């Protein structure tokens, strides 16, 4: 789940408000970061993301790969409320951020270099809870600053965090290229609840009605596409098995649509062989 309603406006608020309200704080970070234990790399990242107190976290075994993609993972030690307080990114400890960073990094490294360049992602900020207003959300895409704030919460489920990371990255791609509201998709696919009902907050494959990968995909069209994107990167064989087992022609068409859209936006082919 991500902030959707008025996303373009909200993103502009976020970027402009941060630049206006955090300017002096970022200068303070640059001047006093060393005294607070921040490394020069932390200080630079805080300046570029406009998040005072930001710290970078290393991920053993994949740091080199992330470096070749140009992505850094960070966290904040104190709650921050960017966008004039409209958004919330909760604080994390070093230990918790290091634990969460491993599956997040594993998900990021599934993307090829060209896709990351097209997406323009440079920073992923791990949050101990993320909100838009009072509503919990999975992530906060901020394309103008080339960053994604990601709620890693209290979950220790590595598979879940990988799926959430790729789900939110797809939201960022659609926001970046102004295709979150996809009229062509809307003409071809229907049946959405247009709400986050509790009984739809299930991500297991096969938990949804025909035409949907899972129950969560039934909430909104953009959530449907993001669920497919993540699943096609993480478990393409399982998606293919579900389509074959159910002979679901609608789900098959959705996979092909997301495959074509992903190739157009990110130069990334997703459809499994044999579809």
Segments from the language model and where they lie:
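Residue-identity detector for glycine
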Residues: 6-8, 33, 37
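Bacterial N-terminal signal peptides that target proteins for export
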Residues: 7-22
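Secreted/luminal cysteine- and crosslink-motif detector
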Residues: 14-16, 32, 90, 128
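Bacterial N-terminal signal peptides
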Residues: 20-30
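Non-catalytic architectural context of zinc metalloproteases
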Residues: 37-98, 126-129, 192, 197-206, ...
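Auxiliary, metal-adjacent structural segments of Zn-dependent hydrolase domains
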Residues: 84-144
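Active-site-flanking segments in enzyme catalytic domains
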Residues: 120-275
């Amino acid at each position: 789940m991500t902030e959707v309603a008025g996303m373009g406006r909200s993103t502009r608020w976020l970027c402009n408000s941060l630049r206006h309200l955090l300017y002096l704080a970022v200068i303070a970070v640059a001047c006093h970061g060393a005294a607070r234990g921040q490394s020069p790399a932390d200080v630079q990242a805080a300046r570029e993301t406009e998040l005072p107190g930001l710290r970078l976290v290393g991920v053993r075994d994949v740091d080199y790969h992330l470096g070749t993609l140009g992505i850094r993972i960070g966290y904040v030690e104190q709650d921050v409320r960017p966008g004039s307080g409209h958004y919330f990114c909760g604080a994390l400890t070093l230990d918790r951020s290091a634990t969460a960073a491993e599956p997040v990094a594993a998900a990021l490294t599934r993307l090829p270099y060209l896709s990351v360049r097209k997406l323009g992602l440079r920073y992923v900020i791990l949050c101990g809870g993320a909100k838009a207003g009072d509503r919990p959300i999975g992530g906060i895409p901020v394309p103008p600053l080339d960053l994604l704030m990601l709620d890693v919460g209290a979950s220790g489920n590595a598979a879940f965090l990988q799926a959430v990371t790729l789900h939110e990255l797809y939201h960022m791609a659609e926001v970046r290229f102004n295709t979150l509201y996809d009229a062509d998709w809307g003409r071809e696919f229907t049946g959405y609840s247009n709400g986050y009902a509790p009984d739809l907050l299930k991500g297991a494959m096969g938990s949804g009605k025909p035409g949907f990968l899972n129950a969560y995909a039934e909430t909104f069209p953009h959530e449907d596409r993001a669920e497919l994107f993540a699943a096609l990167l993480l478990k393409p064989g399982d998606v293919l098995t579900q389509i074959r087992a159910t002979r679901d022609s609608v789900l098959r068409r959705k996979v092909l649509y997301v495959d074509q859209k992903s190739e157009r936006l990110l130069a990334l082919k997703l459809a499994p062989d044999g579809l």
